[in-house]
Amino acid sequence: MDRKFEVSRKTGETDITLSINIDGSGKSNISTGVGFFDHMLNLFAKHGLFDLDVKAKGDLEIDAHHTVEDVGIVLGQAIKQALGEKKSIRRYGSSFVPMDEALVLVALDLSGRPYLVFDAELKCEKLGNMETELVEEFFRAVAFNAGITLHVKALYGSNTHHIIEAMFKAFGRALDDATRKDDRIEGVMSTKGML
């Protein structure tokens, strides 16, 4: 069964169509109007080996908040739907990713229990037309809409771009790990019998 899904969401603030193929090869086609965010989503797809298409139009004349958060909502919904009943997936994933002087850890659990721990000092307030505080909002939106327990921690680093880039790469790698199928797992990876 294909593990892919497409979601469309239209509000008074944004109009988004997103599709993801969990078993892809890292191809992406991203257009949100927020250049730095597009770059980060491309990195997430490439390093997670997901095929990801995102078309978003938002109220960027105000700021990037609605666009970034709503893409996170839709990405979370697409991940959840693409995984279906989560049969035979490894469930847990983690990744340490260095980017020059920065080192980031992402650990996650596809538990169905949404939670975010985000621990990072982002010294630069804006990269391109994106406020760096929106990175946490994005991860929160993904986690809560996909049902992921997600921990994102910058262990150290001084360059905000490097820290955030390492976060998106590590998130892709950790999610790839957690979504991999393992033939040894019968049903789901839980003694409860469901996730």
From Swiss-Prot:
Keywords: Amino-acid biosynthesis, Cytoplasm, Histidine biosynthesis, Lyase
Gene: hisB
Gene3D superfamilies in UniProt: Imidazole glycerol phosphate dehydratase, domain 1
EC number: 4.2.1.19
Domain of life, per lineage: Bacteria
Catalytic reaction equation(s): D-erythro-1-(imidazol-4-yl)glycerol 3-phosphate = 3-(imidazol-4-yl)-2-oxopropyl phosphate + H2O
Family designation: Belongs to the imidazoleglycerol-phosphate dehydratase family.
Protein's recorded name: Imidazoleglycerol-phosphate dehydratase
PROSITE patterns the record matches: IGP_DEHYDRATASE_1, IGP_DEHYDRATASE_2
GO cellular component, one term: cytoplasm
